[in-house]
UniProtKB/Swiss-Prot annotation:
Signal peptide: none annotated. GO terms for biological process: regulation of translation; translation. The keyword rRNA-binding applies. Disulfide bonds: none annotated. This is Large ribosomal subunit protein uL1. CDD domains: Ribosomal_L1.
């Protein structure tokens, strides 16, 4: 059996795996235990009451968190004409069509988000094998294929998170950095849960949001009592 590091021993001693913590207590615990030498992200796992094997129960979308994620995001946009100028004005780092596709084919991938106007999808479609496995393929369901590319760029820069359930029906995403004020982390979590509620598949039965856990990049998960959140999610 692998030997536990001192840090993991402390986490195990402090975190009661059987308990659901009040959100304020949970955040305080994460802050106390975040001792990595970098500013850790605060991640969330939301267990949904869906059957992930059924395509009509899968949950996918995007929402802008009120306080952002604390990450600086580089955006690439496939578009042309007036839309290209609008994308640049909104802050996109890379804007183009075939020229941008050629850069990507050469392995130049210096961006975090890819956005495309509908007329550019004929170009983006050639890049599925490159962008798809990295989770970067533009998709209308998460607002990254849109005629209004400038708004999509602004959303990406403002701290938009994209979410999609995994095969176990769990959503994994980030809600900020551990050095955020506790209130900002709480409000970001509440905003995410509200977005997930709006995205609830009509076919999903029973309790929809079954469990919410938050963790830091290097830390253990802390289960959160939903009763203390202003996003009563069932």
């Amino acid at each position: 059996m692998a030997k536990l590091t001192k840090r993991m021993r402390v986490i195990r001693e402090k975190v009661d795996a059987t308990k659901q913590y009040d959100i304020n207590e949970a955040i305080a615990l994460l802050k106390e235990l975040a001792t990595a030498k970098f500013t850790e992200s605060v991640d969330v796992a939301v267990n949904l009451g869906i059957d992930a094997r059924k395509s009509d129960q899968n949950v996918r979308g995007a929402t802008v968190l009120p306080h952002g994620t604390g990450r600086s995001v580089r955006v690439a946009v496939f578009t042309q004409g007036a839309n290209a100028e609008a994308a640049k004005a909104a802050g996109a780092e890379l804007v183009g069509m075939e020229d941008l596709a050629e850069q990507i084919k050469k392995g130049e991938m210096n961006f975090d988000v890819v956005i495309a106007s509908p007329d550019a999808m004929r170009v983006v479609g050639q890049l599925g094998q490159v962008l798809g496995p990295r989770g970067l393929m533009p998709n209308p369901k998460v607002g990254t294929v849109t005629p209004n590319v400038a708004e999509a760029v602004k959303n990406a820069k403002a701290g938009q998170v994209r979410y999609r359930n995994d095969k176990n029906g769990i959503i994994h995403t980030t809600i900020g950095k551990v050095d955020f004020d506790a209130d900002k982390l709480k409000e970001n979590l509440e905003a995410l849960l509200v977005a997930l509620k709006k995205a609830k598949p009509t076919q999903a039965k029973g309790v929809y949001i079954k469990k919410v856990s938050i963790s830091t990049t290097m830390g253990a998960g802390v289960a959160v009592d939903q009763a203390g959140l202003n996003a009563s999610a069932n």
